[in-house]
């Protein structure tokens, strides 16, 4: 074996091969982390820009549910329902539950809080038959997995930036066609407070049967001769208005949560990149030092053998 061949054997030692494999793995992982960090930064900027318009629409949609709420005396109706001792005539013991979730993830605990609230309501209330509908894909699987017999439908196409009131009405018509005689409805969504804060909110909407408990207050208003039909229409309109408001409130909360989540992910990515960079440089320096030592040792051994 000549001198060059002996030197190649030294450089191709198992220790050097292991070091090269470690460096390659570190380099691949470092590149992956940097790529993901770029993606999270982009998502943060997108969520930040969308939050402005979502916040504006959430504020504008708020008053839509205030008027019907005052007319129907929802607070008094809810109290009467909770404290009623006499059987309610034609009561169906059916409550509609509408959970507003998102179509996409990476938005913190927004969907988890809604699903947790829905499951708690389904487990705790044994007096009523609660039927659940959802908007957004993220709420379907967790609810269907635990309560398949109580799930009605999922409303799609509500994850986009804008949607019309008729779209909300079509979704509600589909629900009401399946459960025409319901006692009450509950819309559960994330109420937007600011860019760093939101909380789960519940909007109670009485059905026609429960409105009868508060009919004296309602009859103070001048209506058409068919007051029962008017009350039913107002109840359904209030349900649509509450869902309309909840959708925009939830979207603003989604954008705020995604902005915070992606900002935290970007910061974590930078920390991991720095740590991997230091680890890579140390491993590379150690490999170079080891190779130099082996080269010098190999050269000395070759000279001695010659």
From Swiss-Prot:
Its main location: mitochondrion. It is a peripheral membrane protein. One of its GO terms (biological process) is proton motive force-driven ATP synthesis. Residues 1-17 form a transit peptide. Keywords: ATP synthesis, CF(1), Hydrogen ion transport, Ion transport, Membrane, Mitochondrion, Mitochondrion inner membrane, Transit peptide, Transport. Component of the ATP synthase complex composed at least of ATP5F1A/subunit alpha, ATP5F1B/subunit beta, ATP5MC1/subunit c (homooctomer), MT-ATP6/subunit a, MT-ATP8/subunit 8, ATP5ME/subunit e, ATP5MF/subunit f, ATP5MG/subunit g, ATP5MK/subunit k, ATP5MJ/subunit j, ATP5F1C/subunit gamma, ATP5F1D/subunit delta, ATP5F1E/subunit epsilon, ATP5PF/subunit F6, ATP5PB/subunit b, ATP5PD/subunit d, ATP5PO/subunit OSCP. Subunit gamma, of the mitochondrial membrane ATP synthase complex (F(1)F(0) ATP synthase or Complex V) that produces ATP from ADP in the presence of a proton gradient across the membrane which is generated by electron transport complexes of the respiratory chain. ATP synthase complex consist of a soluble F(1) head domain - the catalytic core - and a membrane F(1) domain - the membrane proton channel. These two domains are linked by a central stalk rotating inside the F(1) region and a stationary peripheral stalk. NCBIfam families: ATPsyn_F1gamma (TIGR01146). This is ATP synthase F(1) complex subunit gamma, mitochondrial.
